[in-house]
Amino acid sequence: STVIMTQKKILAVASIGGHWVQLLRITHPLEERYEVVYMSTHPKCKSMVGNCRFHTMMDFSRWNAWKMLPASFNILGILLKERPAAIVTTGAAPGLLTIILGRMTGTKTIWVDSVANVQTMSTCGKLARKFATHVYTQWPGLATAQVHYAGNIFGD
């Protein structure tokens, strides 16, 4: 009999821009050991993930928070289709919503706060502490009992 080995699936989520660039720095090395499925707020991000599966999610922020409701249905549909073992995100608001919905479906979740946040955690990062399974900062000075430091995207 043959044994089919299935890789654990990671859903990697970020808004377009700096959050997306940081996510790719973190997740590209994981593609050797895991099935990484990407999700971002702009379809052009698909061109940056090679042959990995890609989903586009609705974008929103605190300035147009009403979009959070339709975005929730969009994200939940993707979560139920993909059924990842874990979700990793670098933000921003759509990544936080994905973590909240992921926890509701029993998925392990990882928030990595942006390297741009040197003095304090981002607003979404502070909220992520209440929902995410694991929360990371990229600055040792921001580490706490709840927020871990494990290096940064520059390899420091």
Region locations from a protein language model:
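Active-site-proximal region of nucleotide-activated glycan assembly enzymes
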Residues: 107-156
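Short hydrophobic segments within beta-strands
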Residues: 12-13, 39, 89, 112, ...
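Conserved nucleotide-sugar phosphate-binding/catalytic loop shared by glycosyltransferases and other
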Residues: 14, 34-71, 141, 148-153
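Structural motif
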Residues: 9, 85-86
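Residues at the starts of beta-strands that form the adenosine-phosphate
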Residues: 9, 34-38, 53, 108, ...
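An aromatic- and histidine-rich active-site surface loop
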Residues: 86-105
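An amphipathic, basic-hydrophobic alpha-helix
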Residues: 63-85
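N-terminal subdomain of nucleotide-sugar transferases
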Residues: 2-45
